[in-house]
């Protein structure tokens, strides 16, 4: 089989105006970035709010393993499948980050015959949204230190500055540093550091803002530190929000591309789900709901991270109600959760599959707590045996879950038609249950953290470390007690220990740090050793990326 990039390069892409035309978007609202990429005019999208809203489908997954699950691939394949059976579907994805693109994961445009294209441009730079977000974030960082340097009012406590710089790259050397060395002319010495851009509060703000006015208001609310009387200082106090908004004006408009089968895809925003809220932009999701019959979106990593944050943060803030969830699983990953080594996954192992099924069942139980109907998408690999596939479908049925074997990676949308039809039956039928959130706004912050950790991660005890409880009390006293919680933890386990596979229960779940993201509208609670600035692996994917003799990019997967 051809590589992802070879498949993408062989495709004949339609003009982006033709893709927009299928959604009845007028030409003057299509802001082209070449022939195959466009941004959609924000004013036009605002005008859609009075139109009927379609159905919302979330694609999530079991706990990820190195064996791979194929969540983005399934999202793309499902969108193509819906369109093949006569449903007007629009998919919504996050934009790839350069960090993982050159690190472990590689690109994030799907795979095989279920991709969004042009994949090279989408994976590398795209329309410059991440550059704009990084620039706006670091402009605020520069203005903070400049404000302190000149002693402007309000006078800030330089040791209280909480706003770090960002870059869209995996670089462990930038995590912690001393800045401002070299004498008074070069600033003032203090500890600082960088996070990856996808962990930026500005990224989260762009993805949760409803329009440009809301974006500016949220930027003003970013807490950057304290004054000398220990009162919180917001970005509005140093007059940074206006220039930041100017940098983000175009980036706020969602990007329109196409799948290999010529169906519309909105790709916009890119917060990670392990260190941020993990969902594409609200503006893109709402646009898809008004432009199509069905909007299909994905949330990062496993359902314990992406889906919970999609429900409790994005849906809470935007008053959205999902109509169905797809839980993506693979035989390979479930066998790995059942104790099989990566090198042995090609061998049939029914016993390990049965053991690892506990992970899928746990995610399904958690999703049921939100009142949303779930269908399992079994993303088939060539090494899967018929006996294993039959066993997994039987296991799903035994706990009341419908499932569909999907081959969209090799067959495109045709390979996900069974999944699309099963979802259509759910979407067309009256709801059996009502959507609900995991906790109410008025619940105390620590109780919210405990609720997520015990109800979703199945922790036995949640342990606050250091000044966590003191900070949470301070946040509540400052009027932020009604905010939802975004827990940053490893994506590799329900617990804080990435080595604890399958479905651990009764574990100790530590909270080592909490951060206030007042602009984004949530509290970040950091657990375990999760880093907001990743590092590169021993042999990063960047080693395999190059330009060939025809000036074409190679090695991008």
Curated annotation (Swiss-Prot):
Superkingdom field: Bacteria
GO molecular function: ATP binding; formate-tetrahydrofolate ligase activity
SUPFAM superfamilies recorded: P-loop containing nucleoside triphosphate hydrolases
GO biological process, one term: tetrahydrofolate interconversion
The protein's Enzyme Commission number: 6.3.4.3
CDD domains per UniProt: FTHFS
Annotated InterPro entries: Formate_THF_ligase, Formate_THF_ligase_CS, P-loop_NTPase
Pathways involved: One-carbon metabolism; tetrahydrofolate interconversion
Reactions mediated catalytically: (6S)-5,6,7,8-tetrahydrofolate + formate + ATP = (6R)-10-formyltetrahydrofolate + ADP + phosphate
Keyword Zinc: no
Sites where the protein binds ATP: 65-72
Sorted UniProt keywords: ATP-binding, Ligase, Nucleotide-binding, One-carbon metabolism
Family affiliation: Belongs to the formate--tetrahydrofolate ligase family.
NCBIfam families in the record: PRK13505.1
Name by which UniProt lists this protein: Formate--tetrahydrofolate ligase
Species of provenance: Zymomonas mobilis subsp. mobilis (strain ATCC 31821 / ZM4 / CP4)
Primary gene name: fhs
């Amino acid at each position: 089989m051809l590589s992802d990039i070879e498949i993408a390069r062989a495709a004949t892409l339609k003009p982006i105006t033709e893709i927009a035309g299928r959604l009845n978007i007028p030409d003057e609202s299509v802001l082209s970035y070449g022939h195959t990429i466009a941004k959609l005019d924000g004013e036009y999208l605002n005008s859609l709010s009075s139109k009927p809203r379609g159905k919302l489908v979330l694609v999530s997954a079991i706990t990820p393993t190195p064996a791979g699950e194929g969540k983005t691939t399934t999202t793309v394949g499902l969108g193509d499948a819906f369109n093949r059976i006569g449903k007007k579907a629009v998919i919504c994805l996050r934009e790839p980050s350069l960090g993982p693109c050159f690190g472990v994961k590689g690109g994030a445009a799907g795979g095989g015959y279920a991709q969004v294209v042009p994949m090279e441009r989408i994976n590398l730079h795209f329309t410059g949204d991440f550059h704009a977000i990084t620039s706006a974030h670091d402009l605020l960082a520069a203005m903070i230190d400049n404000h302190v340097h000149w002693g402007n009012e309000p006078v800030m406590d330089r040791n209280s500055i909480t706003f770090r710089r960002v870059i869209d790259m995996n670089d462990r050397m930038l995590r912690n540093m001393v800045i401002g060395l070299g004498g008074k002319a070069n600033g003032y010495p203090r500890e600082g550091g960088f996070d990856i851009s996808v962990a930026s509060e500005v990224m989260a703000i762009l993805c949760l803002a409803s329009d440009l006015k809301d974006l500016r208001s949220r930027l003003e609310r970013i807490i950057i530190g304290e004054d000398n009387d220990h009162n919180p200082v917001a970005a509005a106090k140093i007059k940074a929000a206006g220039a930041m908004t100017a940098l983000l004006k175009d980036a706020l408009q969602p990007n329109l591309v196409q799948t290999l089968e010529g169906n519309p895809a909105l790709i916009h925003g890119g917060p990670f789900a392990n260190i941020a809220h993990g969902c594409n932009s609200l503006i893109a999701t709402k646009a898809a709901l008004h432009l199509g019959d069905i909007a299909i979106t994905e949330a990062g990593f496993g359902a314990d991270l992406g889906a919970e944050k999609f429900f409790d943060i994005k849906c809470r803030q935007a008053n959205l109600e999902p109509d169905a969830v797809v839980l993506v699983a693979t035989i390979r990953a479930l066998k790995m959760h059942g104790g099989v080594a990566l090198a042995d996954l090609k061998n049939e192992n029914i016993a390990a599959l049965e053991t690892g099924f506990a992970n899928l069942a746990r995610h399904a139980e958690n999703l049921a707590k939100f009142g949303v109907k779930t269908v399992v998408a079994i993303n088939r690999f060539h090494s899967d045996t018929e006996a294993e596939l039959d066993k997994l479908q039987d296991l799903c049925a035994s706990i009341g879950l419908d499932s569909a074997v999907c081959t969209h990676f090799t067959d495109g949308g045709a390979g996900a038609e069974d999944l699309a039809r099963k979802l259509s039956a759910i979407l067309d039928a009256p709801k059996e249950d009502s959507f609900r959130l995991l906790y109410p706004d008025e619940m105390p912050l620590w109780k919210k953290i405990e609720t997520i950790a015990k109800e979703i991660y199945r922790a036995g005890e949640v342990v606050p470390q250091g000044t966590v409880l003191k900070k949470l009390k301070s946040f509540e006293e400052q009027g932020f007690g009604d905010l939802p919680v975004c827990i940053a933890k490893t994506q590799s386990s329900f617990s804080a220990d990435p080595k604890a596979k399958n479905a651990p229960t009764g574990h100790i779940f530590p909270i080592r740090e909490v951060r206030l993201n007042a602009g984004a509208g949530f509290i970040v609670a950091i657990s375990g050793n999760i880093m907001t600035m990743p590092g590169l692996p021993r042999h990063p994917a960047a080693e395999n990326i190059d330009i060939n003799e025809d000036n074409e990019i190679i090695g991008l997967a």
